[in-house]
Amino acid sequence: MSGFDDPGIFYSDSFGGDPGAEEGQARKSQLQRRFKEFLRQYRVGTDRTGFTFKYRDELKRHYNLGEYWIEVEMEDLASFDEELADHLHKQPAEHLQLLEEAAKEVADEVTRPRPAGDELLQDIQVMLKSDASPSSIRILKSDMMSHLVKIPGIIISASAVRAKATRISIQCRSCHNTLTNIAMRPGLEGYALPRKCNMDQAGRPKCPLDPYFIMPDKCKCVDFQTLKLQELPDAVPHGEMPRHMQLYCDRYLCDKVVPGNRVTIMGIYSIKKFGLNPSKGRDRVGVGIRSSYIRVLGIQVDTDGSGRSFAGSVSPQEEEEFRRLAALPNIYELISKSISPSIFGGMDMKKAIACLLFGGSRKRLPDGLTRRGDINLLMLGDPGTAKSQLLKFVEKCSPIGVYTSGKGSSAAGLTASVIRDPSSRNFIMEGGAMVLADGGVVCIDEFDKMREDDRVAIHEAMEQQTISIAKAGITTTLNSRCSVLAAANSVFGRWDETKGEDNIDFMPTILSRFDMIFIVKDEHNEERDMMLAKHVMTLHVSALTQTQAVEGEIDLAKMKKFIAYCRARCGPRLSAEAAEKLKNRYIIMRSGARQHERDSDRRSSIPITVRQLEAIVRIAEALSKMKLQPFATEADVEEALRLFQVSTLDAALSGNLSGVEGFTTQEDQEMLSRIEKQLKRRFAIGSQVSEHSIVQDFTKQKYPEHAIRKVLQLMLRRGEIQHRMQRKVLYRLK
C-alpha cells in the first residue's frame, strides 16, 4: 500500500484527441443524455400492478434524506440500453463521470422546489451492483486494466478515513497568479503542478521554476479510505500464498466494512505509480512499472457471521433435496458416518464434530448481551489417533474453515495485529485467523504446544466471541463468531493412566470454555486392532479406484452446502418439554443423586456448572438444526446429555480433569488444601528449600506424589513460590 500519494502521475483524456474537441464534447453530451434518459424513464412493474420509476423515486427519497448517492444495477442498464452498459463496462472511469452528472441533473429536476438555504445542488455518487459471476484476484491481468471487475474476498485491514482533493486552487509564490477549480482525477492518481508560471510577461521579473503551491483552504475535498482485500481461502491453490489487492473507496463507500468481513466488490481495475523511495539510495528505475489497485464502485457484504454467503447460491432443486435429506429418520447417523469416513471408529467423537459443524442458535438478550451458539470441542490423547485428520476434514467441510497449528500461531496471528501503514505512516489493524473465520470453524492443531500467553489471547474469542484491541491508539472490537476445534497430546506424549490429571497441562479457565472434551486413548484390543488393520489395508488397496462416495454417506460438496443451508435457514430453540427435562436432569446432576452415583460408580460431588448446562443446550439445538426443526425435542436433549456424558463427564469422573473448574472431587480438594496448609507452615516467606526434600517429606506422610506436585504447581501459577538454581530449589515469595 506504499506510494499511493506520489504526485508524479500524468494522464490523458481517452475521449478522442483534444479534450476540448467538438466531436469528443458532442459524444459526451449524447452519452450523458442517454444516461439521464435511463435514470428518468427506467421503470419496474407490470400493467396490472402498476409501474414505478425505480431510480427517479430512489433519487428523490435519498436526496430528501440528505443521502446523496444511488445504487444502479448493471442488469437494469443492460435491459434498457445494452450499448450503454457495454460502454460503462469497458470504459468505466469516463462513463461513470457522465452517469454521475446525469444523476445530478435528474436529482435537480425531481427535488424542485428546494427549501430556502438549500438551493445549492449536491453531487450524487453512483454505486454499481451486478449479479454477474465474480472473478478471482489471480485472473486480473493487463488486458483487464481500466475495465469494470467484480472480485470476492476478505477485508484484512482498513485505513482511517482521510480527505482527498477533487478540485484544487494553486497560486504562484512570485507573482501571486492564481489558478482555481482545477479538476483532479478520482482514485489514487496525483496531480503534477505546472513547472512554469503562465503569467510571464515582458518587463516583469521572471518567475522561478516550480513556483506554484496548493491553497488548502480553497480546495474541495471528499472522504476516502484504503482497504486491503485478500482472496478467499478456498480459492487459494494448495501450497500457495493468498494474493492481496489494494482498494480505494471514497464518499459514502467509506466505513462500510471492517476487517474480517467477506465482501464482493465492483470496481475499476486501475494503476498507480510504483513509488520507489529515492531516500533509500535506489535509482528511480522502471519508468513504465505501475502497481495496481481497484477503485471501488460498489460493495456487497456477503455474510453476517453465520455462513450465509454460501446459502444464497442454493437452487430450488437443491433446497428440495436438502429438505428431503433433513426429513430422513437416520440423518444424524448419516452425517456422522460422512465425517471423515476414511477414519475407523470414534463414532461419538464424529457425532460431536457433526454438532460443532451445525452449531446451536445465537441469542440476543433483552439487555443487549449475546449468548454464543457456536460449540467448542477439544480432543486430548495419544498420537496416531487421527486427531489431525479430523481437523483437516472439518476445515474442508465447514463453509468457512481456517486451519492453524499451535506452534506456528502467535496471539496476534490468531486474534488481530496493529501494523504501520507504509504510505501514510498511520497505524492500521489486520485481522487474524479467528477474525477471518467469522461464521465458521477455527481448527487449532498441537494446542498443547502453544505458549501460555498466546493461549490466553483466545479466551475472550471463545466465550464472548469478540476480540477487543487496545494498541497504538486503536481501541476497537472485532467479531469472531466461530467454533474452535482443538487437538492436543498429553504432557507425557502418550496417555499415562497412573498420572491421572497430570496428563493435562491446561489452565482451568481455557478447559471450561470447551463444551466437550474427549480423551482419545490408543487402547490395545486384539479384536479392535484386527478391524482397524483390515480397514487401513482396504483404504490403501482401493484408494486409486474409489472416486465416488460410498453408499450411505454424503459427499463432501453436498455436505458443505447442506451445513451452510441449515446454519442460514434454521435457528431452533428448546421446546418446553425438553427444557423441563434438562432442568430436572441438571438438578439431579448438581445434587449428586442416585442416578449420578450409578453413572460414576462412586460418590462424587462433581457439580455441572452453568457454562456446561449452556453447552448441553447448544448441542441439543445443533441436533435439531440437522433435521431443520424449529424446536429441540426431548430426544435431542437425551442425545446431548449422552454426548456430554461420554466426553467431559467421563473424563472428569475418571480424575483426568481434576483441578479443572468444577471438576475436582471433594476428598481430593480437601487433601490438596491439607497439603497446602502444612507446606505453608513449614516453608516461611523469604526462605528457600529443595523441591526434592519437600516431595520426600510429604511422601513419608502417605500423601500421593502427584497431589504434592499439583499443590506446588498451583502455588507456582499463583506466584507464591518460584524456581531457582536450575529448578532445583523453591523460593517462597508470599
Curated annotation (Swiss-Prot):
Q: What are its GO cellular component terms?
A: CMG complex; cytosol; MCM complex; nucleus
PROSITE patterns cross-referenced by the UniProt entry? MCM_1, MCM_2
MCM domain boundaries: 331-537
Which E.C. number(s) belong to this protein?
Answer: 3.6.4.12
Q: What GO MF terms are annotated?
A: ATP binding; ATP hydrolysis activity; DNA replication origin binding; helicase activity
Modification N-acetylserine, positions: S2
Q: Using the UniProt record, give the first listed, main subcellular location.
A: nucleus
Where does the record place the modification N6-acetyllysine? K392, K396
* Name of the encoding gene: Mcm5
* Quaternary structure and interacting proteins, as annotated: Component of the MCM2-7 complex. The complex forms a toroidal hexameric ring with the proposed subunit order MCM2-MCM6-MCM4-MCM7-MCM3-MCM5. Component of the CMG helicase complex, a hexameric ring of related MCM2-7 subunits stabilized by CDC45 and the tetrameric GINS complex. Interacts with ANKRD17. Interacts with MCMBP. Interacts with TONSL; the interaction is direct.
Source organism: Mus musculus
Phosphoserine sites (modified residues): S315, S605
Which keywords are on file for this protein? Acetylation, ATP-binding, Cell cycle, Chromosome, Cytoplasm, DNA replication, DNA-binding, Helicase, Hydrolase, Nucleotide-binding, Nucleus, Phosphoprotein
So what does this thing catalyse? ATP + H2O = ADP + phosphate + H(+)
- Which segment of this protein is annotated as the motif Arginine finger? 512-515
Can you tell me which family this protein belongs to? Belongs to the MCM family.
Function, in words? Acts as a component of the MCM2-7 complex (MCM complex) which is the replicative helicase essential for 'once per cell cycle' DNA replication initiation and elongation in eukaryotic cells. Core component of CDC45-MCM-GINS (CMG) helicase, the molecular machine that unwinds template DNA during replication, and around which the replisome is built.
Residues at which ADP binds: R371
- State the protein's name: DNA replication licensing factor MCM5
Which biological process, per GO, is one annotated for this protein? Answer: premeiotic DNA replication
Localisation per UniProt entry: Nucleus; Chromosome; Cytoplasm, Cytosol
